[in-house]
A protein has these predicted regions:
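Short acidic-hydrophobic, aromatic-tinged amphipathic segments that line or gate anion-handling sites
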Residues: 2, 77-81
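Short active-site neighborhood of thiol/selenol oxidoreductases, capturing the structured segment around
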Residues: 11-40
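Structural micro-motif
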Residues: 73-76, 94-104
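Thiol-/selenol-based redox modules, centered on thioredoxin-like
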Residues: 100-139
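N-terminal "domain-start" segment that seeds a small globular fold
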Residues: 1-13, 35, 131
């Protein structure tokens, strides 16, 4: 995988060292998706203690995704899902331009250990993620 800054991510190596959580966002401009990243960012101190890292998959142009990264200040790699190829392989597409918002927890074999599909302004799924990660101090 290559992120929007051109850095190469060895997913297998990453998953062997950390718990990898993939967050898919509907579009780079999605305000609810951006809110979720900001919510999770507020708990990074707890998540770091739980050995968790994140990857954010988004449709859209690099410029739009970079803007979303700037708005959220989410300090993890953002990956442009070109032609929604990754999302299609995970059955996470809404249409040809949008990804179904989801949270995926991968195991060390890159298999989905847990998933939460869907998101709205009343339901983000991050408390459920914290519970499955067994990270304490979640409000």
């Amino acid at each position: 995988l290559t992120d929007i800054d051109g850095s190469i991510i060895n997913l297998k190596e990453l998953a062997s060292k950390k718990r990898v959580v993939i967050i898919t966002i509907k579009t780079a401009e999605c305000p609810v998706c951006q809110s979720q990243l900001i919510r999770i960012k507020k708990k990074l101190n707890v998540l770091v203690a739980c050995n968790v890292t994140f990857l954010v998959f988004s449709p859209g142009s690099v410029d739009k995704i970079k803007k979303a990264k700037s708005i959220t200040q989410f300090p993890f790699p953002f990956i442009m899902d070109t032609n929604l190829a990754i999302s299609k392989s995970l059955n996470l597409t809404i249409d040809e331009f949008q990804i179904l918002p989801a949270i995926l927890l991968l195991n060390e074999n890159l298999e989905i250990e847990w998933e939460q599909r869907g998101r709205n302004s009343l339901f983000y799924g991050d408390p459920e993620l914290m519970k499955i990660l067994q990270c304490s101090s979640w409000i």
